[in-house]
Amino acid sequence: CCSKSHRMRMSRGQQGIGISAAGMYGQLTTGKPVTIISRTGPRAAAHFFEVQIDTKKNEPLVHENKQIEWEQPQGTQVAIEVEGKYQKGRASVDEWLEQTSIANPHVKLTYHTPEGETKEYPRTYHELPPSPREIKPHPYGIEFGMFLKMLQDTKSHSVSGLLASDFCRVSSQLADEICKAAKVSPHTKPRDLKGSSAETLYRTIQDTKIMAPPTNCLSPIGEKAILSGLYKQIKGEFYTAVSRPPAVYRGNPFVIEAGLAYGAAPQDQNKPRQPAMPKAEGERDEEDSELARVIRYANRVPLLYQQSACSTFKAVLSTTWKNYGVTQSRGALPGGPMVIFVHMASVWVPFTSESKEAIADYDEIQKEITLALRECGRRLGLFLRRRERAASEYRRRNIFELYIEEVVEACNRLKGGTLPKEKLKAQLQKIATSRTGGLKTDEALGKTGAGPEGLPHSIIVTAEGVEGEVDLAARVQA
């Protein structure tokens, strides 16, 4: 999202309207001001403010400004008391914080609920994300009205100077070529360019081949951080994450990231299993009828509403999950215990409305989301096929091992009791292991402690432990 001054840099917010609206709502419902404590560093004093909004003049009213003692070395605390109905479940404050914790595993969150509970979302990823750098707007991402405004507001004294200095990826040579193609003098003053001449220049810019904008204005989450966030909050057997290379839509750079958590948490082998209840004819397991859950993000912020209108959700529906061993009805989400994570990082996220609840359909964005989901699905399919083959081989091995003792005893009787039984038992055990996939079977079932071979940026969880790329700092207990 860009700010109102069109700073081309990825950021969580846009124009500060959200915090202003929250403060206004608190003021209207409770009559109490917003309280702010801020300190810029350990050596600086902490300042306390009480602020309200003058609704007639749209100006802040600072009721109190004083220095106080504060235990925090630096940071800002904002407190707003509002009147509202607290509820849990889907699209609630609780879910928003949970999803925020997944996409920001480098952050520690402490949530004090209105019911008196305290929920901790610990920090599990200890690398801070890179700070995005501001870039100049790309010519492809500017609307005609904004282009006209730039012509009037620029400090450049010529059109070619405007193109070269106010846009990224436009050199002086390319600026002269654009002016020549538009039949506009490069030395024309920008303010003198109006009407059809300005429109011709704008169309020429859009038709000119210009290098894609730089991507250092973005700060994607990263595959390891996504894995850490998913593993922290969601119980499962298999996790994977994909970060796509940077792409461009309408001159705006963006990065699509996807993640996937599949399966239920493995049961502890030491705990006694509950006996399975008999099922009526045609009855299915609950997991078989369960649909996947989609969690969507834009610039690390969860999108909880208007799911069906979002480009992310449409890309999930259009992906053929059956190819990866997952059940899916036509036009529906895939079935089974699965959470699908999709994040879009961009300097300008194309939301469908001002409420910023769903991402608009652009072919370039849809393509990148689909490619990321397919890669996640490919890894999931590989895991499921490998696990099924390994489970089959392991069952065969168990059958062989059931008869090893009897074979050893029979051979010992034939030898008149002089056979070295332990040696023969070890040899037969070795044969049974080699004939049923050997170490590959053990690795696929998580019995060796080795990482998931052939599954980059993935985690496999078994009752024996965890394999793959993950920070084992802390896992939130449900």
Report each predicted region and the residues it spans.
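Extended, structured, electrostatic nucleic-acid-contact surfaces
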Residues: 144-168, 184-187
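GHKL-type ATPase core
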Residues: 2-141, 191-192, 196-201
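Charge-rich (often acidic), low-complexity intrinsically disordered regions concentrated
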Residues: 166, 201, 212-321, 332, ...
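Extended, well-ordered alpha-helical scaffold/bundle regions in very large, multi-domain proteins
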Residues: 175, 182-221, 374-407
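Charged, alpha-helix-enriched surfaces in structured cytosolic catalytic cores
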Residues: 12-20, 31, 73, 77, ...
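Structured core elements
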Residues: 18-21, 35, 77-81, 110, ...
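Helix-hairpin-helix
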Residues: 160-181, 478
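GHKL/Bergerat-fold ATPase module
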Residues: 119-145, 174-177, 184-188, 288-388
